[in-house]
Amino acid sequence: MAQGKARETIVSAPGKVLVAGGYLVLDPAYPGLVVSTSSRFYCHARSETPPSSPKSPRASAYTIIVRSPQFVDAVWVYQASTVPATTPSKDNEPKPNWIIEQTAESREKAGRNPFVSLALAYTLRLAAELNGSDELEALLQQTGPKGIEITVAADNDFYSQRETLNLPEGTAPTVDQLSSLPPFSPQKCRISDVHKTGLGSSAAMTTSLVACFLLHLQAVVPKGPDSLETEDLALIHNLAQLAHCAAQGKIGSGFDVSAAIWGSQLYRRFEPKVLQACLDEGEKVFTEGEETKQEREARLSARIELLPVLDPYNPLWEASSLSASGESQSTATEGLAVSSSNHQVPKPAPLQLPPGLDLLLADVDAGSNTPSLVSKVLAWRKDKPAWAKQLYNVIAASNQGLADNLLRLRLLHASDASAYQQFVDSTATQRSTEWDALLKTLPQEAKDDQSSADADASDLDLRVTHHTVLQALIDVRNSLRSIRAGMRELGQRAGVPIEPPEIGSLIKKISDEVPGVVGGSIPGAGGFDAFYIIYLKSSQSPRDLSQLWAQIHAVKEEAESKLTLGPLLSRAGGAKTTSDDEGNDGVDHSSPLSDLFKKLKASEQAGQDFGLRLEQTKSVKGLKEAIARCA
């Protein structure tokens, strides 16, 4: 029997950790530092063109199936079809409306999943606008009776693995136990019942799904086997923001979707009103037969074109450092990104952890209702605007200090990578509480005389000495301490546990007593479910994750903490590099800093591709087997 021609598309997107900027990041005046993770969400789309045969009649609907191999009853089946337009478009040519409906059987068994259904619905609409409805239908016609089959799968760290490992209540998994699990482990529950770890699973899933589906519909075409143009990445970002906001029923801060596209960054929120008209449409995916003809006509008549809104060059997507009150909190990181960019497409300033620093994530066996925390803080800010403004500015200064000091470390590494790593290695063996005394014993060489043209550059001592590297690490440590203090104050003022005392005291003890730990905090909106630690990695005496966790558990036992802490295997990811990052150092070539910025950009572009990524099945361990479980 003749075989059809199969076509596959695979995309992955990383999770995130909001290291600094919780609550403040909702206001464009204040940036947030977002670190992407090594844990990723994968989306695989497959369709098969039937063998050539006499022309078949036009189908009335086209099947789209989305499956997850990790959850019980996680199969969502949809039918895509066109509905004749009841009102003319701008060019007076009636264009059919594309809709999707969930099958009744799928609805009964799997339930609704707005993150999946709205991602598909908006992507289908945008593809029709980009390529034309006829071309889209011709492509779907070629998918045959099986339609498009999509598999979504997440790295294990997105979900708590306590039940997967059959651990007794109050027992946390070990690094070895987590490492022994197969990739994409089944969770033994429905998706609505899973315990998440706060890495941004819904944003990573939504982003990978819209990217994969848009690529599979050939509305966006890669410029090579594994890369996308900056404009296409920005378009996918905007589409994912829309789908994610619609699924949540509100316009959120957007940093999690941004991290899923651009990787680690200094994030500043887009103008929220850019999406308001789209959300006002009330896009919804119904079950077949659930919506009457009159209701559908009324709903579809309110639709607007998506492309003008989602256009990468729409100025409303350009983040502004000015708030509604005219306040501004700009950073050196953003200034460098603007000066070194060739492109007009809005995208965040890349900022990743410097070499020699990494992120440790702890899963706490408790939970926080993030929307409740956020609503209470926003209510306090509205009730006490003067207090809030003052406190927000104090926290923002600490956040800015952290971002700029991390950039300073990256510049020191770019100046002399070997000497930099040598000094990081020696510092990694000592507790952060000992660093200040050590600094006083180190010689501080006088700066060479510099011309007035280099006066701004001379404000930063970029000579790589033990003193300059240690001073920068101390400044990062102090910024993390200040951020924690500010967030504690915010929680006390608003009456919410942004940093619960039992977690805060443990973070302090770990930061003070475990050698090489720079500091830590509670990510995002805070609460009881997680915390992070930033620590130094020694190239001479490396600690594996098990050794580091043994040190943390020793501190926890000494503190007689009752918290149940579990490790995550995820590490810090980097910033995405794009085509417009190449060939521009952002500095006058006559400047002595020109070579330094070239080295900095070269180090950012080295290694693996971060952010949104095109994949091959064979390159992702366990993905082929996970897809097969869905068959």
Where are these regions (language model features)?
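Residue-level detector of functionally special positions within alpha-helical transmembrane segments
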Residues: 200-202, 256, 524
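DPxDG-like acidic metal-binding loop motif
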Residues: 198-223
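C-terminal nucleotide
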Residues: 1-20, 24-26, 34-149, 153-195, ...
